[in-house]
Amino acid sequence: MRSAAVLALLLCAGQVTALPVNSPMNKGDTEVMKCIVEVISDTLSKPSPMPVSQECFETLRGDERILSILRHQNLLKELQDLALQGAKERAHQQKKHSGFEDELSEVLENQSSQAELKEAVEEPSSKDVMEKREDSKEAEKSGEATDGARPQALPEPMQESKAEGNNQAPGEEEEEEEEATNTHPPASLPSQKYPGPQAEGDSEGLSQGLVDREKGLSAEPGWQAKREEEEEEEEEAEAGEEAVPEEEGPTVVLNPHPSLGYKEIRKGESRSEALAVDGAGKPGAEEAQDPEGKGEQEHSQQKEEEEEMAVVPQGLFRGGKSGELEQEEERLSKEWEDSKRWSKMDQLAKELTAEKRLEGQEEEEDNRDSSMKLSFRARAYGFRGPGPQLRRGWRPSSREDSLEAGLPLQVRGYPEEKKEEEGSANRRPEDQELESLSAIEAELEKVAHQLQALRRG
């Protein structure tokens, strides 16, 4: 009996354990599973979609497990995006490094090629310099030989040069001489070390042309007077430039290359013109002489002129760097103009300050004088005031005393008012002058600031 009872109890217990217990947690899970099934069926049935109910949406949104799963998926997507970005950036940096290396290699190759080209160019340039030196020596020798052989055939070229000098206009000769002197640089520049054969040939041709022109000009007395006047004007201009003070010409020191060659040319021209004046002053004597005597005189004159002018080409016309000289001259002229402007500005400022000081002193003196006069008058009135009172005390009933006491005060009051009006009228133009001076000073300061900015720029 007992065994049967135990078996019955065991069977009952097994049945009880096999039956499901409907707990609230199980109900929620079942609802979530149903909603998931609906969503899956909706996604699978795309041609004919089956819509998900609103209750399923709410249950899925409220379930934390589904939210965590979705967040996890989003994190995975973000990590994938970051990984892709990192890979792209690495590839870009590698490309940059490779491009930079390529550029460096190209630059190094270019530098090496340029160095090779420079070496290849310097070798023939040194050869050219040596050849130019040899050519210049040969040209000097040939020039000396031609100078020695030239006096034999002088009379005919002299006549031709005279005819050409008479035919040429004075204005054209002036222009040609100025061009000849301006186009050739001075000999004192350090950069022009080696004279070329072309420069020496040009110098010889120029000396011959100057000699011929001066001889042609010797036949024109009016032209000689013009030349003398021009020389006097040039000397006056040079003297004025030398007399400029150091304050106005600070940039004169900046010129390290004085044009000595030009001065030598001017000396040669003055001597040749003096010779030409002597020749023109004695036309009758030359006509009276024989043609042989004329030829000898002209021969001696030409020798002297050639000896004087031979000194000039050796120092002048070295190199062909007229462009650099022109640039230096332009720069120096600009600096000279700037210095003149600054000196003028300084002078104007000094004058304005001196005028202001004088005006201030005059105003102070006027104020002192007026204050002294007023104090003196006040004292005078103070001392004279008791007079009528005493008189009134002595004779109070007299009418004449009262009139005498009242008149001076009234009469003396009028000139004071007149003087004050005159002082105010005089002060008005003074105030206007001060205002105009202050405006001029402000404009000068603005101009000075602009010049400083331009210099710094």
Curated annotation (Swiss-Prot):
Subcellular location: Cytoplasmic vesicle, Secretory vesicle; Cytoplasmic vesicle, Secretory vesicle, Neuronal dense core vesicle; Secreted
Keyword Disulfide bond: yes
Keyword Glycoprotein attributed: yes
Acidic residues biased stretches: 171-180, 229-249
Tissue expression from the record: Detected in cerebrospinal fluid (at protein level). Detected in urine (at protein level).
Stretches with biased composition (Basic and acidic residues): 116-144, 263-272, 291-303, 330-360, 414-431
Signal peptide: 1-18
Methionine sulfoxide PTM sites in chain numbering: M372
Modified residues (Phosphotyrosine): Y194
Biased composition regions of type Polar residues, renumbered to the chain: 182-191
UniProt record, GO biological process: adenylate cyclase-activating adrenergic receptor signaling pathway; defense response to bacterium; defense response to fungus; defense response to Gram-negative bacterium; defense response to Gram-positive bacterium; innate immune response; killing of cells of another organism; mast cell activation
UniProt region (O-glycosylated at one site only in cerebrospinal fluid), positions on chain: 41-59, 181-191
Keywords, in A-Z order: Amidation, Antibiotic, Antimicrobial, Calcium, Cleavage on pair of basic residues, Cytoplasmic vesicle, Disulfide bond, Fungicide, Glycoprotein, Oxidation, Phosphoprotein, Proteoglycan, Secreted, Signal, Sulfation
Principal localisation: cytoplasm
Pfam families membership: Granin (PF01271)
Residues covered by region (Disordered): 88-440
Sequence positions bearing Glycine amide: G319
Residue positions where Arginine amide is found in the record: R456
Processing after translation: Sulfated on tyrosine residues and/or contains sulfated glycans.
Subunit-level organization: Self-interacts; self-assembly is promoted in vitro by chondroitin sulfate attachment which occurs at mildly acidic pH conditions. Interacts with SCG3. Interacts with ITPR1 in the secretory granules.
Protein family membership: Belongs to the chromogranin/secretogranin protein family.
Further remarks about this protein from its record: Binds calcium with a low-affinity.
PANTHER family: CHROMOGRANIN (PTHR10583), CHROMOGRANIN-A (PTHR10583:SF1)
Stated name of the protein: Chromogranin-A
Annotated organism of origin: Homo sapiens (Human)
